[in-house]
């Protein structure tokens, strides 16, 4: 928003950084084929319409450019992830019963199969690689409870009191699973890397 943009410009006024305000669906402030690398950190799953985002990304990439993104992975591949998810959502849905009925973004982005097909439709002359990985976070139960909650948008709709109660339950879960005072939270992720092949005309 305007206030965030103003603050960013003020804080980096003496640097070479340049800030532009826009949406991922429309970045006309940038010229065609003007970026070597475009990185999207966990935002692609929230974007709708996502096809316009991908079209814009393709327009901005140079011939051998790279588009990389971190996207939610398969929850069944990460031990303990669903347990943490269920603790958080139990608290949220006790206050907001309909929360989670509708997911944000395009559902095709939420599975590796749907994502592969979606990317192939836009990035015709690119190599597309989707790699499932898990990220492990290790800390004392109290610290890990707060860190893990921060990865779930649902936790931010709770009041301070309800949020604190949720953290208490998360801490209890991590205490029960700790080893030598340290617990682990595992998050499933799909790593998307799209590379331009170059060396010829692209299909548009």
What function would you assign to each model-found segment?
Residues 1-29, 52:
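Class I SAM-dependent methyltransferase SAM/SAH-binding core
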Residues 20, 39, 68:
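Conserved Rossmann-like nucleotide-binding pocket used by diverse enzymes
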Residues 104-204:
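Conserved Class I S-adenosyl-L-methionine
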């Amino acid at each position: 928003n305007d206030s965030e943009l103003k603050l960013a410009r003020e804080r980096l006024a003496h640097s070479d950084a340049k800030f532009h305000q826009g949406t991922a669906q429309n970045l006309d402030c940038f010229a065609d084929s003007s970026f070597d690398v475009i990185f999207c950190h966990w935002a692609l799953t929230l974007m709708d319409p996502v096809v316009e985002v991908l079209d814009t990304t393709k327009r901005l990439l140079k011939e051998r450019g790279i588009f990389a993104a971190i996207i939610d992975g398969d929850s069944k591949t990460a031990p303990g992830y669903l347990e943490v998810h269920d603790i958080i959502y139990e608290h949220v849905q006790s206050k907001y019963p309909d929360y989670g009925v509708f997911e944000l973004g395009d559902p095709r982005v939420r599975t590796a199969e749907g994502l592969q097909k979606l990317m192939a439709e836009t990035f015709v002359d690119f190599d597309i690689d989707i790699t499932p990985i898990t990220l492990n976070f290790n800390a004392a139960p109290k610290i890990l409870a707060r860190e893990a909650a921060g990865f779930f948008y649902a936790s931010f709709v709770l009041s301070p009191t309800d949020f604190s109660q949720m953290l208490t339950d998360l801490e209890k879960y991590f205490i029960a699973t700790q080893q030598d005072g340290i617990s682990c939270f595992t998050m499933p992720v799909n790593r998307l890397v799209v590379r331009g092949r170059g060396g010829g005309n692209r299909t548009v």
